[in-house]
Amino acid sequence: MAWRFELLNKPYGGITEGPVWDGEALYFTHISNHRIMRYDPVSGAIIQAREGTNHTNGLCHDAQGRTYGCCSGGRSIIRFESDGTTTTIADRVDGQKLNTPNDLATDLKGRIWFTNPWNAVNIDPSEVEELDNRSVLRADPQPDG
């Protein structure tokens, strides 16, 4: 089977990542400019959907349609709220800071699975790696929210 490729827009002069489809549009991150972009396949328009994302790369949606991101600059997993704020879901494991989360997925139980490599490019140079592993982790929702 042959595939045809389409360039959506000119190169961004930085890394793009985290494409996720919401049923109407494609969202992706422009990591170095701290933005989430939205591509509308009907009009062909690409607009800035959110700014100030602190090196967020991987994106996903849960069963309720909420958007989550791996905020490598904040060393956390966050949820982007509809009012423009963010909620930190996880930023530590056993009291130690996450490394630099990269990609994530949610499952039907509402759990968030994510990769946790060390990528010093996306954080302040004074930061240090606290976890002694680069792994896949799972965050389980707790009764207290």
Region spans (language model):
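Sequence-structural signature of mature extracellular/luminal beta-sheet repeat domains
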Residues: M1-G145
